[in-house]
Swiss-Prot record:
This is CDAN1-interacting nuclease 1. GO terms for biological process: erythrocyte differentiation. The lineage of its organism: Eukaryota, Metazoa, Chordata, Craniata, Vertebrata. It comes from the Eukaryota. The keyword Cytoplasm applies. It is found in: Nucleus; Cytoplasm. InterPro entries: CDIN1. The gene is CDIN1. Plays a role in erythroid cell differentiation. GO terms for cellular component: cytoplasm; nucleus. The keyword Membrane does not apply. Keywords: Cytoplasm, Nucleus.
Length: 281
């Protein structure tokens, strides 16, 4: 789904001060019925992550952490079965999984002899049964499963969806009888930064030569696309030549402005691929 900047801004404006819940996503779908659920979820997640980055610091002051921890303790003393942490996160407009991390780290600092390592905290967030306090373990679990933008469950889902779309792209390339090298093969040859697929014989798409294809199982907004251009796409272009990026959940139309320089954007696998044959001397 390709959106104009104005269409995207209209959706983004509806997400201001909206909690990251499945109920909010359902309301968004009702407001924009012509947009796919996957596209709206991707935009929803990206906009919320921008909000969290803007407000992250205020939740990590020593005063804020102590206030949250005391509110958590008071809440579970009254009713340990109530979703105290989840409600606290929603009240202060912070991601439930990130709130769970703050409280877990504060708990471990108090009850363990040595400061908790990041790997220990990550392991406990992935498997709350490792947390030595049953009430806190349940509170953390509630935060993880009810967070649709952050946390180990979301990370797992995103990884699986990304892999699924890479497999889809591979199948489409094979269906078109296009010869390619994938990321693993390229790294085995010593390349450190590679697109998902390098075409061994370049193709033409809409009159543009394509040497590589990158799969992105997300919506291409300004923030993410400019970061990808800087960190990935221009590096690919510099090393391998012009290429194609597929944003499977759509992108902002105005971002497709580097075609003449050698980076095309698509929201699906192109249907008008022309295979270029090597000339025989």
């Amino acid at each position: 789904m390709i959106l104009t900047k104005a269409q995207y801004d209209e959706i983004a404006q509806c997400l201001v001060s909206v909690p990251p819940t499945r109920q909010s996503l359902r309301k968004l779908k009702q407001r924009f019925p012509s947009q796919s659920q996957a596209t709206l979820l991707s935009i929803f997640s990206q906009e919320y992550q921008k909000h969290i980055k803007r407000t992250h610091a205020k939740h990590h002051t020593s005063e804020a952490i102590e206030s949250y921890y005391q509110r958590y303790l008071n809440g579970v003393r009254k009713n340990g079965a109530a979703p105290v942490l989840l409600e606290l996160a929603n009240e202060v407009d912070y991601a439930p999984s990130l709130m769970a991390r703050i409280i877990l780290e504060r708990f471990l600092q108090k009850h363990e002899e040595a400061p908790p390592s990041k790997s220990v905290i990550n392991s406990m967030l992935r498997d709350p049964s490792q947390i030595p306090d049953g009430v806190l373990a349940n509170q953390v679990y509630q935060c993880i499963v009810n967070d649709c933008c952050y946390g180990p469950l979301v990370d797992c889902i995103k990884h699986a969806i990304g892999h699924e779309h890479e497999v889809l792209l591979r199948d489409l390339l094979l269906e078109k009888n296009l010869s390619f090298l994938d990321e693993d093969q390229l790294r085995a040859r010593g390349y450190d930064k590679t697109p998902d697929f390098i075409l061994q014989v370049p193709v033409a798409v809409e009159g543009h030569i394509i040497h590589w294809i990158e799969s992105k199982a997300s919506f291409g907004d300004e923030c993410s696309h400019h970061a990808y251009l800087h960190d990935q796409f221009w590096s690919y272009w510099n090393r391998f030549g012009p290429g194609l990026v597929i944003y499977w959940y759509g992108f902002i139309q105005e971002l497709d402005c580097n075609r003449e320089r050698g980076i095309l954007l698509h929201a699906c696998f192109p249907t008008d691929i022309v295979t270029l044959c090597h000339s025989v001397a």
